[in-house]
């Protein structure tokens, strides 16, 4: 509440906290998830923010400007995970859940990041190693191969197509996304 009450000089947008709850309760890592609604006059935009607790960040946290959709507003700067740690955490989630994952967003985010940013291989490898260790996971080559095989899995293809319709994107087919 203190954060969203901070004076910014922006009187047009208001925020309401809908829910705050622990995330990843059953896992060996934790955090807090907040569901909010932003309002500009009669327009409501729901969104969520996850606050990680106890995560390993490689090489270090980053300050990142979040672009706004309205030209007259200053882009806020927030502390974020490094992109390498973001990739590692998403890959960890995919490998942990395998075909039970309904989070096509993780696949999309990895695809987007791989196409938008250049990564240092050594730094990314270190982020993967430390994230997997921190979460108590050891993955095999066979698990990676199984994820790649999802490209020809009808159920996963169906989930991917539904996700793409939901976010209104013309992103490549699921098999291409997996190869990226």
Report the location of each language-model feature.
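Structured mid-to-C-terminal alpha-helical surface segments
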Residues: 1-180
